């Protein structure tokens, strides 16, 4: 009898210890045939979780994608209401014809074609290329940067969604860049809109000149892979957002090239930086639209229309010239135009 009581007590203690253990983590495994699982199977490892093999399924990135879609639809509705609202005294057709008759639209279309060709061939430098040429054509820094950022809202939004769908976005890197980048963009847009264009123009041109030299310097760099988490990402995002808004471009050359230059994975770095760029471009475009006013809309239309026809030219450049030659050419053109803009600012 006593032995039975001892056995019963031991069994009760064992059951109690089992019930007090923390529950095992429920893992959402990806059991499909894919490259990662094939590698794990060869090494005798278990399948990866679904969030690893399909990063676009992460709730944070799904929310980001829906936010991009919602904001793009809202912008289209706003622009349509502004264009066809009879309260402005003119019909939408009249406004379109007036824009097409002006030289501003066609100059901006040529700039948009060139800048989007460069961006399509190199994957960056749309902002600094278009801003450099707009400044040379006589636009003020605020109007040039405002036009570029408003035009970029749609391209960066579509690009960001594409990168998420292709699994090119690192959630942690995206979140670390997002808020600092937006704060920097707001501060930069307010700064360039608040200072007289004649005063700030030579400084913006000097910044673009340095960016041209920076692009040229990439021709001579060799990148070594680095799997460690990048440091000072928030500071980099804040600085990149600020100079991007002030100079009309630079988020990609500053942030992407800095992170990739330290050895970070190019695929997820480019995707994460592109997705974050939409949100900082959006907030800076709002600030510019409030502070600059109606001035940039013909330039915005020209940049967008010109950029629509750039794809075949970008493909041709990519096929005929290697990336190093393109970098050297683009960096040289931006630097030369910036020197010209500095000369004009002081004469």
What are these regions (language model features)?
Residues 2-115, 120, 132-137, 141, ...:
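Juxtamembrane transmembrane-helix boundary motif
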Residues 128, 132, 136, 143-156, ...:
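Early transmembrane hairpin of solute transport permeases
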Residues 145-153, 270-278, 308, 334:
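Transmembrane helix-bundle signature of multi-pass membrane transporters/permeases
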Residues 150-158, 183-184, 191, 275-283:
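Membrane-embedded alpha-helical segments of transport systems
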Residues 247-250, 274:
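Short, contiguous, pocket-lining structural segments
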Residues 271, 284-287:
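Feature detects amphipathic, helix-rich regulatory segments
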């Amino acid at each position: 009898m006593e032995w039975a009581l001892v056995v019963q007590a031991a069994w009760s203690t064992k059951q109690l210890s089992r019930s007090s253990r923390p529950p095992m983590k429920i893992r959402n495994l990806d059991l499909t045939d894919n490259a990662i699982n094939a590698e794990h199977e060869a090494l005798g490892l278990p399948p990866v979780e679904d969030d690893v093999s399909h990063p676009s399924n992460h709730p944070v990135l799904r929310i980001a994608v829906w936010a991009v879609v919602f904001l793009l639809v809202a912008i289209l509705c706003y622009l349509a209401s502004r264009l066809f609202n009879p309260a402005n005294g003119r019909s939408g057709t009249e406004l379109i014809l007036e824009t097409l008759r002006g030289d501003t639209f066609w100059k901006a279309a040529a700039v948009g074609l060139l800048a989007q060709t460069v961006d399509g061939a190199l994957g960056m430098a749309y902002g600094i290329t278009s801003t450099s040429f707009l400044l040379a054509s006589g636009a003020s820094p605020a109007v040039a940067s405002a036009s570029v950022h408003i035009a970029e809202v749609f391209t960066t939004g579509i690009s960001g969604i594409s990168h998420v769908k292709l699994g090119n976005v690192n959630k942690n890197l995206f979140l670390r860049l997002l808020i600092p980048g937006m704060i920097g963009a707001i501060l930069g847009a307010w700064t360039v809109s608040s200072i007289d264009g004649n005063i700030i123009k030579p400084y913006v041109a000097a910044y673009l000149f340095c960016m041209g030299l920076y692009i040229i310097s990439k021709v001579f760099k060799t990148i070594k892979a680095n799997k460690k988490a990048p440091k000072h990402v928030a500071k980099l995002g804040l600085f990149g957002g600020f100079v991007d808004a002030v100079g009309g471009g630079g988020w990609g050359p500053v942030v992407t090239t800095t992170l990739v230059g330290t050895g970070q994975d190019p695929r997820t770095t480019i995707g994460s930086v592109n997705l974050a760029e939409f949100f900082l471009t959006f907030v800076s475009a709002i600030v510019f639209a409030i502070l600059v006013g109606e001035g940039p809309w013909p330039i915005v239309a020209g940049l967008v229309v010109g950029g629509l026809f750039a794809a075949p030219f970008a493909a041709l450049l990519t096929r005929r010239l290697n990336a190093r030659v393109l970098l050297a050419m683009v960096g040289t053109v931006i630097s030369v135009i910036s020197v010209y803009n500095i000369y004009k600012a002081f004469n």
